[in-house]
Curated annotation (Swiss-Prot):
NCBIfam families xrefs: leuS_bact (TIGR00396)
Source taxonomy: Bacteria, Pseudomonadati, Campylobacterota, Epsilonproteobacteria, Campylobacterales
Predominant localisation class: cytoplasm
InterPro entries in the cross-refs: aa-tRNA-synth_I_CS, Leu-tRNA-ligase, Leu_tRNA-synth_edit, Methionyl/Leucyl_tRNA_Synth, Rossmann-like_a/b/a_fold, tRNAsynth_Ia_anticodon-bd, Val/Leu/Ile-tRNA-synth_edit
An example Gene Ontology biological process: leucyl-tRNA aminoacylation
Family, per entry: Belongs to the class-I aminoacyl-tRNA synthetase family.
Protein name: Leucine--tRNA ligase
Gene expressing this chain: leuS
One annotated Gene Ontology cellular component of this protein: cytosol
Organism: Aliarcobacter butzleri (strain RM4018) (Arcobacter butzleri)
Residue ranges annotated as motif 'HIGH' region: 40-50
Length: 821
């Protein structure tokens, strides 16, 4: 048979499309598999990263579909976002037109790969129907107290003119455009993810078997749970007066209450209210005020990597236990978003505090000593365990015991409380841009902030806008933002901020799980969600570990609590695929090392691209592009296709009734290679994900078949191999299966045959006093006595004239004779 990839691939892609071959059954009687690759942003062209992601997902979907599962394998488009606005400015196109033209082009590109998506469930997150249901969720979250509006210091991208969440910063720069981010005070909407911090942390335990440990660790660290003591520092009388009595105290949180007697200074974040007040009122010399202002302009993330710097605020607080005064500084290492933006500093037992104290010549008081009890002139902080010294009634107690005892003492005397803190911050979702989902709230002078009525949703974007790159066009639109208050009917204005695009990707998997026939009536069908959720296999890059993956977990829990789903975790299994490299670097236009998938498909065919992508490296590892390996993949498919000529009618008539016992040793070996590939297939798709080893096993099986002349073995071999390879090279396999088996080998799982794996003989090592001397070959059912007789004959020259003290037979492994002398 001649292999002409273009003709074969076009034929089967049209067949699959016309017959809706990959739509899931609406019946819920079968066991299901929900396979999902992270949906793409419609940037205009697919790249090799897309190809790898979607070929992996498609392999899973096809495997489980032919294994008689009801498979949901959808595709859609994460279509809101700043790149559309930037493209609108550059190409003078409306963002909507640019976006949907890209979707049309990329849809055709993905089709050319032969991906088995459910077409009926395709949507874009910029579709008004998707926006409608998302806005309903936002209103319900607002009513439940999960969404709120406040003014805060935010990360501002001067280039994109929008706010960024902490998770969207990369080394202090915008994750999208790379512009250095600045700090800015402005009002915005926040989603209370911190309300779910403990559940998000606890439920990582449920994922530890099937998620990469690196992702779990990243999320655990990002949530950042810590237990400790929260207490107040009272300002000294003189400091209260200096601050014009605007402040009398502030609160700090510490995970080391055992070191509280070693506090030698306190430090505040540059954004702390006291620091802001001092700057606003010019309560310090001009030089210090300028230095503080400069510190305030630097994002927290950047400050964390800078050299530790501080400024004496010339105020003092009282130690809560000793009553002694302690100087207060502003320091660049204190985070306003953690523990109230204030810390107690114990230089003797914290390396950061130690370095700061050394730099500014602040006192260092040791209050914990090691087992030797020696107090030394410290060159670094003592952070090991030990016993307390110079700590009043707690002196002599181990620091572990002291933590509990000091917290108890504070609580009993109402000085402070035991508290759990998290590094995780509430999620700021306001974005000052046009191409996003409008936030469905209205500002009324009389009623304040009012959600839009559910029956008025969606709040859709106006299309008559001009994108200039200067501010948000919704702010200046002549009519769109002007409306009436849903509560009192008076004149009001719409919120012009739009939602962070990570909101859309935080629930799209639940939308897919809803039968598309119900999309007009509900955003999420609970009945359908109960059947399809959780996603059985999710595929995407590890770069989403603390952005999309955390937000998706959070949103699922919120929607559960709001009654939309019973699911608590969205993704059972997670596979994070590695990057595709060329010349040792990530493909990029600037490096000139981009490989265009369209050109590869045009030259070799989609099956070759798929085979190379899945064979070149395990999916979780980086993949180095190799032109000669692509050629090799093409040659294998061509050989596999052409060798099918060896399958004749005689073999097709008889392969299902092969008598294994009547086969020659070579025939049995060839048949075993085929079934080993089938066994490997089941293992790869459920446990190891190592598609490369499966493909190698199929190549070995084909080589083994080539040595045979048994018609039935050839027919059975192709019956099984076309089934195994269908998830990887589907077009070629459907073509062969149709010609040879009328596609019947894709109906249900092919069962393993035990007789194929039955051992014909066993090789046993024969050892004398533990030293291997020879080997014997015996049948699997040979008795122990027969084995010993055969072993003695084989090792006679080493046993000659020796007294055998012991005879040991280890089944299926060895025979050992222990002899005297």
């Amino acid at each position: 048979m001649e292999y002409i990839s273009k003709d074969i691939e076009k034929k089967w892609q049209n067949f699959w499309s016309e017959n809706q071959s990959f739509e899931p059954s609406s019946s819920k009687t079968k066991e299901k598999k929900y396979i999902l690759s992270m949906f793409p942003y419609p940037s205009g062209r697919i790249h090799m990263g897309h190809v790898r992601n979607y070929c992996i997902g498609d392999a899973f979907a096809r495997h489980f579909r032919k294994s008689d599962f009801n498979v949901l394998h959808p595709i859609g488009w994460d279509s809101f976002g700043m790149p559309a606005e930037n493209a609108a400015i550059k190409h003078k196109l409306h963002p909507k037109k640019w976006t949907y033209e890209n979707i049309d082009y990329m849809r055709d590109e993905l089709k050319s790969l032969g991906l088995s998506f459910s077409k009926n469930r395709e949507f874009a997150t910029s579709d008004e129907l998707y926006t409608k249901w998302e806005q309903e969720f936002i209103i319900k979250m607002y009513e439940a107290g999960i969404i709120y509006r406040k003014s805060a210091t935010v990360n501002w991208c001067p280039h994109d003119q929008t706010v960024l969440a902490n998770e969207q910063l990369e080394e202090g720069c915008c994750w999208r455009c790379g512009t250095e981010v600045v700090q800015k005070e402005m009002p915005g909407y926040y989603i209370g993810i911190t309300k779910y911090a403990q559940e998000l942390l606890d439920d990582l335990e449920k994922l530890k078997e099937d998620w990469p440990s690196q992702v779990l660790t990243m999320q655990e660290n990002w949530i950042g749970r810590s237990e400790g003591l929260e207490f107040k520092f009272d300002l000294s009388k003189e400091s209260r007066a200096k601050l014009e009595r605007a402040f009398t105290k502030y609160f700090v949180f510490t995970t080391r209450p055992d070191t509280i007697y070693g506090v030698s200074y306190s430090a505040l974040a540059p954004e702390h209210p006291i620091v802001k007040y001092i700057v606003e009122k010019n309560l310090l010399p001009e030089k210090k005020i300028k230095a503080i202002k400069a510190m305030q302009k630097i994002p927290e993330r950047d400050r964390a990597t800078q050299e530790k710097e501080g400024i004496d605020l010339e105020i003092e607080v009282m130690h809560p236990l000793t009553g002694k005064t302690i100087p207060v500084w502003v320091a660049n290492f204190v985070l306003s978003s953690y523990g109230g933006g204030a810390v107690m500093a114990v230089p003797a037992h914290d390396q950061r505090d130690f370095e700061f104290a050394k730099k500014y010549n602040l006192p260092i008081k040791q209050v914990i000593v090691g087992p030797d009890g020696i107090i030394e002139n410290q060159t670094e902080a003592y952070t090991a365990e030990g016993r307390l010294i110079e700590s009043e009634n707690f002196t002599g107690v181990t620091n572990i015991e002291a933590k509990k005892a000091i917290i108890y003492h504070f609580e009993q005397n109402s000085f402070g409380i035991k508290k759990v803190n998290y590094k995780l911050r509430d999620w700021g979702v306001s974005r000052q841009r046009y191409w996003g989902a409008p936030i469905p709230f209205i500002h009324c002078e009389k009623c304040g902030l009012v959600p839009e009525k559910i029956e008025n949703l969606p709040v859709a974007l106006p299309e008559d806008v001009e994108i200039t790159g200067e501010g948000n066009p919704l702010d200046t639109h002549p009519t769109w933002k002007h409306c009436t208050c849903p509560k009192c009917g008076e004149k009001a204005t719409r919120e012009t901020d739009t939602l962070d695009t990570f909101v859309q990707s935080s629930w799209y998997f639940l939308r897919y799980a809803t039968d598309n026939k119900k999309w007009n009536e509900v955003g999420i069908s609970k009945e359908d969600s109960d059947y399809w959720m959780d996603v059985d296999q999710y595929i995407g890059g590890i770069e989403h570990a603390i952005l999309h993956l955390l937000y998706a977990r959070f949103f699922t829990k919120v929607l559960r609590d709001l009654g939309y789903t019973n699911s608590s975790e969205p993704f059972k299994k997670l596979l994070t695929q590695g990057m595709v490299l060329k010349d040792g670097a990530k493909m990029s236009k600037s490096k000139g090392n981009v490989v265009d998938p369209d050109l590869i498909i045009d030259k070799y065919g989609a099956d070759t691209a798929r085979l190379f992508i899945l064979f070149a490296a395990p999916p979780t590892k980086e993949l180095e592009w190799n032109d000669s390996a692509v050629e090799g993949a093409f040659r294998f498919i061509k050989k596999f296709f052409e060798r099918a000529e060896n399958v004749n009618q005689n073999g097709l008539d008889n392969f299902k009734s092969i008598d294994h016992s009547a086969l020659s040793k070579e025939e049995k070996e060839a048949r075993k290679k085929v079934y080993e590939a089938l066994l490997k297939s089941n293992e790869v798709f459920t446990k190891t994900y190592t598609f490369n080893t499966l493909i190698a096993s199929c190549m070995e099986a084909l080589n083994a078949l080539q040595t045979q002349k048994n018609d039935s073995i050839w027919a059975e071999g192709y019956y099984i191999l076309t089934n195994i390879l269908e998830p990887i090279i589907p077009h070629a396999c459907w073509e062969l299966s149709k010609k040879l088996f009328d596609l019947k080998n894709f109906d249900g799982k092919i069962e393993l045959k035990e007789e194929v794996f039955a051992l014909e003989s066993i090789i046993l090592a024969v050892t004398v006093n533990g030293k291997k001397r020879c080997e014997i070959e015996v049948a699997p059912d040979t008795s122990k006595d027969e084995i010993l007789v055969k072993a003695k004959i084989a090792s006679a020259k080493w046993l000659e004239n020796s007294e055998i003290l012991k005879e040991i037979v280890v089944p299926n492994k060895l025979v050992n004779f222990v002899i005297k002398g």
